[in-house]
Amino acid sequence: MSKVAIIDFGSQFTQLLARRIRELNVYCEIFTPDVEFDLVKDSKAFILSGGPKSVASLAEIPKIVHNIIELNKKSSIPVLGICYGLQLLSNYFNSAIVSDCSKEFGKATLNIIKESEITKNVWEVGKRVDVWMSHADSVYNVPRGFEVIAYSVLKNVIAMICNEERKIYGMQFHPEVYHTTDGIALLSNFIKIAGCKTDWTMNSFLDEQQRVIKKQVGDKKVIAAISGGVDSSVAAALTYRAIGDQLHCIFIDNGLLRYNEAEKISQLLVNQFQMPITIVDKSSVFLNKLKSITDPEQKRKIIGKTFIEVFEGEANKIGGVEFLMQGTIYPDVIESGGAVGKESVTIKSHHNVGGLPDVMRLQLVEPLKLLFKDEVRLLGKELGISDEILMRHPFPGPGLAIRIIGEVTQEKIKMLQAADDIYINLIKKYNLYNIIWQAFAVILPVKTVGVMGDSRTYGYTCALRAVTSSDGMTAGCFPFGVDTDTKLIFYEFLQEVSNAIVNNVDGINRVVYDTTSKPPATIEWE
């Protein structure tokens, strides 16, 4: 099986880059810059990722870059540098790197000035294309032995270079990000240049993970953290296929679930999997520990720690349990700063990862931690899981606690459950649910004055969020648009939702819609 080695210098997009390579049915692994070179020297190609550091301030080029270039000199093994990776390659080949003067973030337009194997049948000379930039440093002059493929139109920055003879390529932009035009096609060309076999599939991943789980667990018992979401459901189905009745499924009602969630999910999972599921109501425990807590990181860590404590308690009741299964996926790990490359910057802690206590009495089984959400759904289809589960919108482990900005109270939970239920039901009514990546309501810590029935009100503000995405790493505001059957337009839909919430949910007198993309915002508010 062909392998592409990605050297991770700390980019938030590194795991997404790996996803894009696997999407091309090519196996890839991610390594830190201090990896022993013997572990990666048999790769078919190397990709140097982006990263938050500045090449301009580096004392010396990392040893791994020297080793890769030396190997390339002997064998012409293809090398691709992205953003920071481009700057490392350029600096190695005697180009100056300058800081700040030509920084670009977000959408940028390129002018293609040269043909190349990596742009073959994708971009023609003279074409202008939109890409996604995220850099403060720039390559000042053309590296020795290289030619420029493209410049940034606005800043006239070197955006793409090549040394065709040695099969070394560099991109200042991020081809792996959804918003880069033809980014996947560029990566596909790089894979072709490397001569990689396209034989890695979700079916092969399924087979391999079953072997991994069996080897890790042996004949020991596993307790499964079931939430009813896509991730935990697929993880449970995969683990159950691997070890059968050694798996014990537990559904924790933490009091932070959506309206009637516990009842709906338990019925759905039992019908789908025919596995016994124990429902444990610990809502009072979670709510008591969250009392007076307003900081989102504290909330996440408290919920994560309590989550583990409860599961350890349930494991003790079963007896002989040594493993805890969780539905952790790649974006959870990335945003917690716990990706394979440890140089990335933490965005937020996730209850499955950043909130775990340092010392645990249960070992973790995380069969999905290498997959993105869309891959998880593909794996679910391989496992025969119904669309009713697979197409559910993502729901965070900390639940409504991070959709209530500020202190979590029973009053706010009830308000949010009711408002969110109205919003989602109207989305489903107009057949929008399956084309929206994620939609939810948020209770803000802001009260505003209103008038209802000739009386003054002073109620909470509810924010609505709906986004489009393919992987959860970048996201845009869902525009609603015009439904061809109902002719419902953006404003009319939001007005219907707003009226329904204000008229039916006590305590809310104002509704707003969040139009912010990711980045700069995250999808969740906390």
Swiss-Prot record:
Task: Report the active site residues.
Answer: C83 (nucleophile), H174, E176
Reaction(s) catalysed by this chain, per the record, are: XMP + L-glutamine + ATP + H2O = GMP + L-glutamate + AMP + diphosphate + 2 H(+)
Q: Which residue numbers delimit the GMPS ATP-PPase domain? A: 200-392
Q: Describe the location of the Glutamine amidotransferase type-1 domain by residue ranges.
A: 3-199
Record-annotated residues binding ATP?
Answer: S227, G228, G229, V230, D231, S232, S233
Q: In which pathway does it act?
A: Purine metabolism; GMP biosynthesis; GMP from XMP (L-Gln route): step 1/1
- InterPro entries recorded for this chain? Class_I_gatase-like, GATASE, GMP_synth_C, GMP_synth_GATase, GMP_synthase, GMPS_ATP_PPase_dom, NAD/GMP_synthase, Rossmann-like_a/b/a_fold
Give the EC number(s) under which this enzyme is classified.
6.3.5.2
One Gene Ontology term, aspect cellular component: cytosol
Give the main EC class: ligase
Q: Which domain of life is it from?
A: Bacteria
PROSITE patterns from the xrefs? GATASE_TYPE_1, GMPS_ATP_PPASE
Q: GO molecular function terms here?
A: ATP binding; GMP synthase activity
Q: Which UniProt keywords apply?
A: ATP-binding, Glutamine amidotransferase, GMP biosynthesis, Ligase, Nucleotide-binding, Purine biosynthesis
Query: Partners and quaternary state?
Result: Homodimer.
Query: What does it do?
Result: Catalyzes the synthesis of GMP from XMP.
Full protein name = GMP synthase [glutamine-hydrolyzing]
The species this protein was found in: Ehrlichia canis (strain Jake)
